[in-house]
Curated annotation (Swiss-Prot):
InterPro entries found in the cross-reference section: PLipase_A2, PLipase_A2_Asp_AS, PLipase_A2_dom, PLipase_A2_dom_sf, PLipase_A2_His_AS
Residues engaged in binding Ca(2+): Y43, G45, G47, D64
Stated name of the protein: Basic phospholipase A2 10
Protein's job: Snake venom phospholipase A2 (PLA2) that inhibits neuromuscular transmission by blocking acetylcholine release from the nerve termini. PLA2 catalyzes the calcium-dependent hydrolysis of the 2-acyl groups in 3-sn-phosphoglycerides.
UniProt cofactor note: Binds 1 Ca(2+) ion.
EC number: 3.1.1.4
Gene Ontology CC annotations of this record: extracellular region
Compartments where located: Secreted
GO-annotated molecular function: calcium ion binding; calcium-dependent phospholipase A2 activity; phospholipid binding; toxin activity
Keywords from the named record: Calcium, Disulfide bond, Hydrolase, Lipid degradation, Lipid metabolism, Metal-binding, Neurotoxin, Presynaptic neurotoxin, Secreted, Signal, Toxin
Length: 135
């Protein structure tokens, strides 16, 4: 349940660098501001449960699962692992050894950013009550 969950809020301690990298990937791949994904649907933002409300929310669910899988390999912490990538709008390229922690995390973020850019954004799914809609 990471999808942009810790990005950009005011008056909070500095956040893990890879979340800043994820924010930058989102900006590279699409036109929507990253903050639009912070509290969207059942899976974008902190936590995640229930059935995704739409295609965009499924992107966040997939990203959560991708991070979960990355953590299963060695001592990989996707929330703190930085990585190398290039952005040539709207193209993103992950660098580093395939199968490494950094590359796996980068691939998760890249796939999510591309998915976000391709999915329709439904404003009515922003800020929904997760307790009632995400069971």
């Amino acid at each position: 349940a990471v999808c942009v969950s810790l990005l950009g809020a005011a008056n909070i301690p500095p956040q893990p660098l890879n979340l800043y990298q994820f924010k930058n990937m989102i900006q590279c791949a699409g036109t929507q501001l990253w903050v639009a994904y912070v509290n969207y649907g059942c899976y974008c933002g902190k936590g995640g449960s229930g059935t995704p409300v739409d295609q965009l929310d499924r992107c966040c669910q997939t990203h959560d699962h991708c991070y979960h899988n990355a953590k299963r390999f060695g001592k990989c912490n996707p929330y703190f692992k930085t990585y190398e990538y290039t952005c040539n709008k709207p193209n993103l390229t992950c660098r580093g050894a395939k199968g490494s922690c950094g590359r796996n995390v980068c691939d998760c973020d890249r796939a999510a950013a591309i998915c976000f850019a391709a999915a329709p954004y439904n404003l009515s799914n922003f800020g929904i009550n997760k307790k009632t809609h995400c069971k």
